[in-house]
Amino acid sequence: MHAIMLKAKLHRAEVTHAVLDYEGSCAIDGDWLDLSGIREYEQIQIYNVDNGERFTTYAIRAENGSKMISVNGAAAHKAKVGDRVIICAYAHYGEAELASHKPRMLYMAPGNQLSHTSEAIPIQVA
């Protein structure tokens, strides 16, 4: 059995740039790519918390320490500067990998400050 699982997530990052006339992609602070395990040119899903848009693009590296999230190309129609987004990467895992799989999640505070990291989402209670 194989399953598609969450590999990495940047939770509630703020869009810092939306550049329509740029080759399509999403530039992400290189430190965050390294910490999350998201690779350059890897497919990512972006969920816009502020307007409900959901779209697919690929990650490119922004300058380390820049705190940049730049939504580029046609995707710039889906997010504006200041929007809060969730950026996710998914991967296929075999049955042997599933038992030990833990996603890498980065949680952002206002101003794209890294709040904390986690490998699990708390159980939701009523």
UniProtKB/Swiss-Prot annotation:
Enzyme Commission code: 4.1.1.11
Job of this protein: Catalyzes the pyruvoyl-dependent decarboxylation of aspartate to produce beta-alanine.
Main localization, broad class: cytoplasm
Enzyme category, top tier: lyase
Entry GO CC: cytosol
Compartments, record wording: Cytoplasm
PTM sites of type Pyruvic acid (Ser): S25
GO biological process: one example: pantothenate biosynthetic process
Record: residues binding substrate: T57, G73, A74, A75
Pathway: Cofactor biosynthesis; (R)-pantothenate biosynthesis; beta-alanine from L-aspartate: step 1/1
Keywords annotated in UniProt: Autocatalytic cleavage, Cytoplasm, Decarboxylase, Lyase, Pantothenate biosynthesis, Pyruvate, Schiff base, Zymogen
Cofactor remark: Binds 1 pyruvoyl group covalently per subunit.
Assembly description: Heterooctamer of four alpha and four beta subunits.
Keyword Cytoplasm among UniProt keywords: yes
Reactions that this protein is recorded to catalyse: L-aspartate + H(+) = beta-alanine + CO2
Cofactor(s) required for function per UniProt: pyruvate
Protein origin, superkingdom: Bacteria
Protein name per UniProt: Aspartate 1-decarboxylase
Active site: residue positions: S25, Y58
Processing and modification events after translation: Is synthesized initially as an inactive proenzyme, which is activated by self-cleavage at a specific serine bond to produce a beta-subunit with a hydroxyl group at its C-terminus and an alpha-subunit with a pyruvoyl group at its N-terminus.
Annotated family: Belongs to the PanD family.
Gene3D superfamilies reported for this sequence: 2.40.40.20
Single annotated GO MF: aspartate 1-decarboxylase activity
Organism name: Pseudomonas paraeruginosa (strain DSM 24068 / PA7)
Keyword Disulfide bond: no
